[in-house]
Each structure stands twice: as structure tokens, then as C-alpha cells.
A protein has these predicted regions:
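Surface-exposed, short loops/turns at beta-strand junctions within beta-sandwich domains
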Residues: 115-122, 208
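Short, compositionally biased P/S/T/A/G/V-rich stretches that sit at domain boundaries
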Residues: 25-62
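Short beta-strand segments within Ig-like beta-sandwich modules, predominantly Fibronectin type-III
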Residues: 102-109
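Short, aromatic- and glycine-rich surface loops/edge beta-strands on solvent-exposed regions
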Residues: 120-132, 214
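Intrinsic-disorder/low-complexity signal
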Residues: 144-268
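Contiguous beta-strand segments within globular domains
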Residues: 54-74, 148-152
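Edge beta-strands of extracellular beta-sandwich domains
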Residues: 134-143
């Protein structure tokens, strides 16, 4: 019987599967679960509660079928943090839903709960831990009769403690923004985030045909006046169908008060 010495290379290869398992365990994704599901009943409310002055993405009153929820167990030290520094910038996780990437704010214990309205069909969700990039992915098929989103506009940005606002003007002149979040034509804005990162999401199941205009306003940055933040705008049409189209735009926002028309487009 031959004996084979376990050198450093062999040891690393032997431990690789265990290391991968340990890394993936850092990211816990409770819902949505992978596989096949048929959600029954009325579709959950798209709108979130807004409580000023510090308004965040929140999951108040949502059932599990309308949430992306879980926990990241190992968090990096906040950027610029020192001993006793409670004001260091947060580092968000990264959420990717059906190919659209956006920041995911975390609680102090690493927990997250992001409302999301999934239509019928196949969906993919990925959560990436900040700093390490360790990810957890799931795919599922929603077989229930769910209302599809024919137009979704997602605004996110890359700085903490800043307030950017999404403004969507429909062809019929209806203007949806934080001051008027629900339009008579069926379009709605889910939340007004005032504490950094976003996202703010406009969605419509029946967008009227014609010219659409999307603006981003740099509303404020607290006492700071020199915070440059990069806004990301994703425009998704015919979501979950063979005709689905995604476009992503990135625009630097240099100072509070700046209003930028990011995208104009036509819908048939």
C-alpha cells in the first residue's frame, strides 16, 4: 500500500469544498425559496410606509411571498470606522433581481427585508455580502395568476445619508414623485428613501402609450454640501416576457438641488 504525503496544495484542494460551504453560509436567504410556487389571493400592496424625516425601505405588514428576506452573518467594519465611531458610513449589500442590481440596506445585525412584487413566471434573486462579495442565489417560478409589471423604473445611488428622488412623468401628464406617489393611470412609487442608497421603484401594470420622461432630483445630503453621488436608473419594460428589455443608466449628481432628466422614451 502506497502512502501519499498531503502537501500544502493537496490540503488546499481537500479543504476547498468546506471553505466554499462556509462562505455561502455567511449569506442566509429565507425567502423567496427556490422551486415552484403558486401564490393565491390578492396581490400584496406595492406601497410602503413613509415616516419622515428618516424614511427607509421597510417591510411593515408584508407577507413572505412579497419579501426578499434573510441575513448576512459576517459584516465588514464600516468605512472610516474607528474606536467608538458610530457615524461611519454603512456598507450596503448587493441585491440582484432578475438581472437588475441595486444596493440592499442591512440592519445592525445583518438582517434585511426588501418588499418586491413578483409577477407570474421565472425569477432569479441573488444577495451579495458587502466587502467579501460572497453570494447566495435562488431561482423560482411563480405559477399563480399574478399581475405583471409592464414598466418598472428603479432608482438607486451609491452614498449613505443622501436623499435622491425619482420623478416619472407619463404621456398623460401625470407626475409621480414623493409628494404624489399614486397616479390614476395605475402607476405608483413604492417609497421615498431619505437616508441613502435607495432604491425607489416606480411600477405600472398598464402604462399608457406615448412619451415618458424620468428625472432624478438631488434633494439633500444633511449638513454636507459637497457629497457627489452616482445615481443608477434601470428601466425595465415587459418584465417577465420574451419581449423584456432592460436599460441601465448612471449619472453623477454633484450637489443638492440638482435636477437631471436621465431618460426619455416611447412606449407603444
Amino acid at each position: 500500500m502506497k502512502r501519499v504525503a498531503m502537501g500544502p496544495v493537496w490540503l488546499a484542494l481537500a479543504m476547498a469544498p468546506m471553505m466554499a460551504t462556509s462562505a455561502s453560509a455567511q449569506v442566509q436567504l429565507d425567502t423567496p425559496a427556490g422551486g415552484w410556487r403558486a401564490t393565491s389571493g390578492a396581490q400584496k400592496d406595492f406601497l410602503q410606509e413613509v415616516n419622515y424625516p428618516a424614511a427607509n425601505v421597510n417591510a411593515n405588514g408584508r407577507s413572505a411571498v412579497a419579501l426578499i428576506q434573510g441575513r448576512i452573518h459576517t459584516l465588514p467594519k464600516p468605512k472610516g470606522a474607528g474606536a467608538g465611531d458610530d457615524d461611519a458610513a454603512r456598507q450596503p449589500a448587493r441585491l440582484v433581481v432578475d438581472g437588475v442590481a441595486l444596493p440592499l440596506s442591512l440592519n445592525e445585525d445583518g438582517g434585511f427585508a426588501r418588499p418586491w412584487s413578483f409577477g407570474s413566471g421565472a425569477h432569479g434573486v441573488e444577495v451579495r455580502a458587502p466587502g467579501t462579495g460572497v453570494a447566495r442565489r435562488t431561482q423560482f417560478i411563480e405559477a399563480g395568476a399574478r399581475t405583471g409589471v409592464k414598466l418598472r423604473v428603479v432608482l438607486s445611488w451609491d452614498s449613505d445619508g443622501t436623499d435622491l428622488d425619482l420623478h416619472v412623468v407619463a404621456p398623460d401628464g401625470q407626475h409621480v414623485f414623493y409628494g404624489d406617489r399614486v397616479a390614476a393611470n395605475g402607476g405608483a412609487l413604492d417609497v421615498d428613501v431619505t437616508t441613502g442608497f435607495g432604491p425607489e421603484i416606480y411600477a405600472s401594470p398598464t402604462p399608457p402609450a406615448g412619451a415618458w420622461h424620468v428625472y432624478v432630483n438631488y434633494y439633500g445630503a444633511g449638513e454636507r454640501r459637497d457629497v457627489i453621488t452616482v445615481a443608477q436608473l434601470a428601466v425595465i419594460t415587459d418584465e417577465g416576457t420574451p419581449r423584456e428589455r432592460q436599460q441601465v443608466f448612471r449619472v453623477p449628481m454633484r450637489k443638492p438641488g440638482e435636477l437631471t432628466r436621465v431618460r426619455s422614451f416611447q412606449l407603444p
